[in-house]
Curated annotation (Swiss-Prot):
Pfam families: KH_2 (PF07650), MMR_HSR1 (PF01926). One of its GO terms (cellular component) is plasma membrane. Residues 17-190 form the Era-type G domain. It is a peripheral membrane protein. This is GTPase Era. HAMAP family: GTPase_Era (MF_00367). Monomer. One of its GO terms (molecular function) is ribosomal small subunit binding. Its main location: cytoplasm. SUPFAM superfamilies: P-loop containing nucleoside triphosphate hydrolases (SSF52540), Prokaryotic type KH domain (KH-domain type II) (SSF54814). Residues 25-32 are annotated as: G1. Residues 72-75 are annotated as: G3. It comes from Streptomyces coelicolor (strain ATCC BAA-471 / A3(2) / M145). GO terms for biological process: ribosomal small subunit assembly.
Amino acid sequence: MSVRTQSSEEPAETVHRAGFACFVGRPNAGKSTLTNALVGQKVAITSNRPQTTRHTVRGIVHREDAQLILVDTPGLHKPRTLLGERLNDVVRTTWAEVDVIGFCLPANEKLGPGDRFIAKELAGIRKTPKVAIVTKTDLVDSKTLAEQLIAIDQLGKELGIAWAEIVPVSATANQQVDLLADLLTPLLPEGPALYPEGDLTDEPEQVMVAELIREAALEGVRDELPHSIAVVVEEMLPREDRPADKPLLDIHANVYIERPSQKGIIIGPKGKRLKDVGIKSRTQIEALLGTPVFLDLHVKVAKDWQRDPKQLRRLGF
């Protein structure tokens, strides 16, 4: 078993490489946090709720020797709704298109049926190199980490997966994140940069704004609600008649839930929760866009939207 740590780092190649890597894993395995750490800026929303990622987000890592485009997929799981099936389809389509797959497995949780389910799917993809990434290493001691590394090595042997690398990382503590980029780079094809210098994602601004609002709305809600929340930015326009040195961006967005009974959970007593969502997301949006924002939020019911193909399309899935 070859496990990489910082001391075993090899010199960088002189050729330039560019390509796509995708992180897979069950929900809440740390994929979005790792994407943000590698890019150096928030491009994917994170939450301690599973299943928060719904779109494939391309985060772009610029290096002297390479451009690494990270595709952050939803967590693969056994679907219970049409939305769940759509999310799984997104994952499998992404796998077929990337140059390297990173399988994220949390250090603080023993391998379970969900991990085996994904590993079996990966075993069927023969040509694409696969890197096992042991995430959240800051949450365990060295003995637990060693046991997890051995278990992952054994899982690969059992299913016929030849791991290109097994890399322990902590995105939150910034441990071995640069090493991971170093190890992914040689697995990319040689070629020029695919995106301009300075671009960190190809997500449209309206999608990123909607995701930041959804991230704020996910905080502190009960377990059944996260999957019922969708956000659509209806309008994003500079306020007219503002002086050039005091711009203001008007953003009008709708937060959709599935049942009228969920409205009170999102809005909160006397509108306090919705106000908190607005304040938190506005701060993040202003940091992202670099301009003051007026955020107008409304909560609407889209009945059982996760199971309705028409509603899914209208909400961008």
